[in-house]
Amino acid sequence: MGIGPVKAIPKALKQAGLQQKDIDLIELNEAFASQSLAVIRELGLNPDIVNVNGGAIALGHPLGCTGAKLSVQLFDEMRKREMKNKYGVVTMCVGTGQGAAGIYEFLN
């Protein structure tokens, strides 16, 4: 756990050839509220696009299923917004401070 997404998000954006301003929605996994706050502050994320339907504290984060669960949540929200939102990020905190991030493009 921890703030691994602080390193993972910029790396994923660079690999995708995108910038933070290109991202429309973010599903940020957190086991504790302080993790989300730290990642949002460190990266200067817009809180209005982070966990728009609630995060793992409210909805749960099943062990070993976080990435799949958050990805489906992101896809569903992108679909609901009828492609007004093109890019989304999913992050996963991993034990011992590791972090992972995936970037998705919504295509019609």
Q: Where are the predicted features?
A:
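Claisen-condensing/thiolase-fold acyl-transfer catalytic domains that form or cleave C-C bonds
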Residues: 1-108
